[in-house]
Amino acid sequence: MGTIKPLNTLLCMIAMLFATSTLASTNASKKEYPGGKYYIWRYTLKDKQDSPYSLDHPGRWLSHKSIERRRRQGLALDSTDLPVSQKYLRELEKQAAGIARGREKRRTEWTIIGTSRWHNTVLMRSNDVRLLEDLTELPFIMEARQVWQSPDSIERGQAKVKVHDGWNPWDSIRGEYYGNGRDQIEMLNGHRLHNIGHKGSGMTIAVLDGGFQNCDLIPVFQKTNILGVKDFVYPNSTHFYRETDHGTKVLSAMAANEPQILVGTSPEARYWLLRCEDQQTEQPVEEDYWTMAAEFADSAGVDIISSSLGYNEYDNHLGDYRLRDLDGKTALISRTASMLAGKGIILINSAGNLGMGPWKKITFPADAQDILTVGAVNNDRKNAPFCGVGPTQDGRVKPDVTALGSPASLISGRGTIIRDMGTSFSTPIVAGLVACLWQALPNKTALEIIDLIRQTSSQYQYPDNVYGYGIPNFWRAYMIGKVNNE
């Protein structure tokens, strides 16, 4: 018995040392959230009273291309297009400043970080949650909710990723124009649109994502017509191109134009790169960021949005959704998405990769109405098991279509060819060809293009909740659309 006690003591000491070492290692990979504790609240305003803007003069806040896109499709402007009331914004700022001055023991900071025209909402950020609560008493605020709070700590930023100087010898597929991208475009019969000159020229695509690592340095993107970038998560960030490479891979599926290496589905389109996904946290405010990005895309005159993002639950369960919410009308992000076709924009959104988990279904905003939700298949045209399935709660077919995403050929943030899996990557493959089809059929409306793609997919006559309407045939869509135009 005398030897057992020292042995137990020794084992306990080893366990404590191991636990301490593990904790130290974990802590070393994290850092305190910059600036301390902050909160973001969303305020819904009751109306757009005393607006200096008029639907008769939309050029004051919408680009000519945006106005022309609507005119071409016969779409009228409405009250949702008007900016939020400047009077209410000034009153919010005045009241917040007054409350802040009354705080004696601490420095109170606050700022309006964004608005939504379509939902008539305002986002305010402050380190004083009581200030945000007090503002809810203002008579023009119809609804208020917290949509973000800073975490106690975040992962340390990743080291700078070096870009490769050139392609590896094995990246080239000699004699194959599309290189590694051949299967993903030929599966959709999109190469035939390219063969007659429709490669996305004249079309503008907004890519909504979480990061576009090294898109400013990777040689293949030097040929890409990038109109601009905008960060809705950290508007003043100087590291736009140093975040995750998820958006880099997404962009490459459309914009790459390196024959025998990788040619994407719309190499001649123009692009806006819009960051609206916060990689450090997962909270409802990202729906607001996504909405702000979509509204920006609208005002900039974008034709198509490619979004490989989806949500269903959040950190600290702040605003988690239930399956019954998959109706296209409940989640803010889904309500935004459902409005896009009515503004003349086609949204192509990923179905989500939760098919093998407890959720199993598509995520938000994949449940939206009048969009193309994209699932994933493998090279044998078999469903990828990770793909979220339908239907929506109100019985609509989802996903709408499927494309190669298990795996897809892409360009990483290092500038190398990789193969990655997910509906994140089948989505831009489809989005690029939507641009080519719309280029070929410029007189079609957003809704007509969406319907044409569904109707010419492989199982339009017998859709299901796994493949939706099936694998699109963009050449067939073009031929039928062309006949209908004549």
Where are these regions (language model features)?
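Subtilisin-like serine protease catalytic core
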Residues: 181, 191-230, 236-286, 300-303, ...
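N-terminal domain-start motif of subtilase-like serine proteases
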Residues: 25-34, 112-116, 128-133, 156-207, ...
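Hydrolase catalytic cores
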Residues: 251, 274-278, 303, 361, ...
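Short acidic, glycine-rich surface-loop motifs adjacent to enzyme active sites
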Residues: 295-327, 350
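Inhibitory N-terminal propeptides of secreted protease zymogens
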Residues: 27-163
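N-terminal signal peptide c-region/cleavage motif recognized by signal peptidases
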Residues: 19-21
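Catalytic-core regions built around general acid/base machinery
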Residues: 327-344
